[in-house]
């Protein structure tokens, strides 16, 4: 498991998607590094405010997963998140899509039912959402038409593959080629080819995979050892599944790129075929001129065969000779 650093967390948050797998994988990583709860929540809060509107709700889903699943290990995250949640809920309710209101209310109801936080604090969070509904600046209203939910974005991406290809400028070919090569090179180190991790997973003890073997545990010390092993196995598998999910998306993107690249090459091929035909015609015309020129040259008289018109003849008289009286 990779060590904690703020830059590593920022990178993981930038890659966070709305899928349950992505949220749970990052949640497990954060819980594993719970001794850094303070910096983690600080970075989470900062990145939440910087995130695009259609990703903000996912940040709260992540916080929910971390808060609820870390309670049995300690109160660190529950306490640290409490200090920023009022601002976070207010910010998300104000900046995110209108459709976020119900998920936020549902999340607060769950926290109230499970006593994640006290009733007074839950009420404070609800009030922060209501306060955020005060008339925003005009710029916010103008942005609403541009906001899309994660599902809409996914549907639009799916619509783009493969039927709705839009023709590309053939001159974009070199750029597409570079992008395609990079995508293929990136997949050389894909999760599915990570033999080291696969070997670790294959080497996991049977106890972490078979519930029936739990009956053999008779003392607390053995149970705690197994609990630690299970946590590590869960973290290993969750992270690997997350990498596999990311690889799957990369391969989908590569498939879309291949469709685009193939169409681009077809466009280039069509253009080059026209150019080839054009230059074939030019070659034919130049060849015809060459042939006619050669024939014309052969029809001209050979001046070297003419007699020497100056040899053996007397020189012409000079002007003085013409007017001489002799």
Curated annotation (Swiss-Prot):
Subcellular location: Nucleus
Positions of the CID domain: 2-133
Cellular-component GO terms for this entry: nucleoplasm; nucleus; transcription preinitiation complex
Ranges for region Disordered: 127-149
Keywords: Acetylation, Nucleus, Phosphoprotein, Transcription, Transcription regulation
KW Endoplasmic reticulum (keyword) present: no
Modification Phosphoserine, positions: 132, 134, 166, 299
GO terms under biological process: mRNA 3'-end processing; positive regulation of cell population proliferation; positive regulation of transcription by RNA polymerase II; regulation of cell cycle process; RNA polymerase II promoter clearance
N-acetylserine PTM positions: 2
Keyword Transcription regulation part of the UniProt annotation: yes
Tissues expressing this chain: Preferentially expressed in a range of tumor tissues including colon, lung, liver, breast, prostate, stomach, uterine endometrium and cervical cancers with higher levels in tumors than in adjacent non-tumor tissue (at protein level).
Main localization (coarse): nucleus
Biased composition (Basic and acidic residues): 128-144
InterPro entries (UniProt xref): CID_dom, ENTH_VHS, RPRD1A/B_C, RPRD1B_CID
PROSITE patterns linked to this entry: CID
Residues modified to Phosphotyrosine: 161
Entry GO MF terms: identical protein binding; RNA polymerase II C-terminal domain binding; RNA polymerase II complex binding
Pfam families linked to this entry: CID, CREPT
Function: Interacts with phosphorylated C-terminal heptapeptide repeat domain (CTD) of the largest RNA polymerase II subunit POLR2A, and participates in dephosphorylation of the CTD by RPAP2. Transcriptional regulator which enhances expression of CCND1. Promotes binding of RNA polymerase II to the CCDN1 promoter and to the termination region before the poly-A site but decreases its binding after the poly-A site. Prevents RNA polymerase II from reading through the 3' end termination site and may allow it to be recruited back to the promoter through promotion of the formation of a chromatin loop.
Family to which this protein belongs: Belongs to the UPF0400 (RTT103) family.
Subunit structure: Homodimer. May form a heterodimer with RPRD1A. Associates with RPAP2. Associates with the RNA polymerase II complex.
Name of this protein: Regulation of nuclear pre-mRNA domain-containing protein 1B
Biological classification of the source: Eukaryota, Metazoa, Chordata, Craniata, Vertebrata
């Amino acid at each position: 498991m990779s060590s904690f650093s703020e830059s590593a967390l920022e990178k993981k948050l930038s890659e966070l998607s709305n899928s349950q797998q992505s949220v749970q994988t990052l949640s497990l990583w954060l819980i594993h590094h719970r001794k850094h709860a303070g910096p983690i929540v600080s970075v989470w809060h900062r990145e939440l405010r910087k995130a695009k509107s259609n990703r903000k709700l996912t940040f709260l889903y992540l916080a929910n997963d971390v808060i609820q699943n870390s309670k049995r290990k300690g109160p660190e995250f529950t306490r640290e998140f409490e200090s920023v949640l009022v601002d976070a809920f207010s910010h998300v309710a104000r900046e995110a899509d209108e459709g976020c209101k119900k998920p936020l209310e549902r999340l607060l109801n769950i926290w109230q039912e499970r006593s994640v936080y006290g009733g007074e604090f839950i009420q404070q969070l609800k009030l922060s959402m209501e306060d955020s509904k005060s008339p925003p600046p005009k710029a916010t209203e103008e942005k609403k038409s541009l906001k899309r939910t994660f599902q809409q974005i996914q549907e639009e991406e799916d619509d783009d593959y493969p039927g709705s290809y839009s023709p590309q400028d053939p001159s974009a070919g070199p750029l597409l080629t570079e992008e395609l090569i990079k995508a293929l090179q990136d997949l050389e180190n894909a999760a599915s080819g990570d033999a080291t991790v696969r070997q670790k997973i294959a080497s996991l003890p049977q106890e972490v995979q078979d519930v029936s073997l739990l009956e053999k545990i008779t003392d607390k010390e053995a149970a705690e050892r197994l609990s630690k092993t299970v946590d590590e196995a869960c973290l290993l598998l969750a992270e690997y599944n997350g990498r596999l999910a990311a690889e799957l998306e990369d391969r989908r993107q590569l498939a879309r790129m291949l469709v685009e690249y193939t169409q681009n090459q077809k466009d280039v091929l069509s253009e080059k075929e026209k150019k080839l035909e054009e230059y074939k015609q030019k070659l034919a015309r130049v060849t015809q001129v060459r042939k006619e020129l050669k024939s014309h040259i052969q029809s001209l008289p050979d001046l070297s065969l003419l007699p020497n018109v100056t040899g053996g003849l007397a020189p012409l008289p000079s002007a003085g000779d013409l007017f001489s009286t002799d």
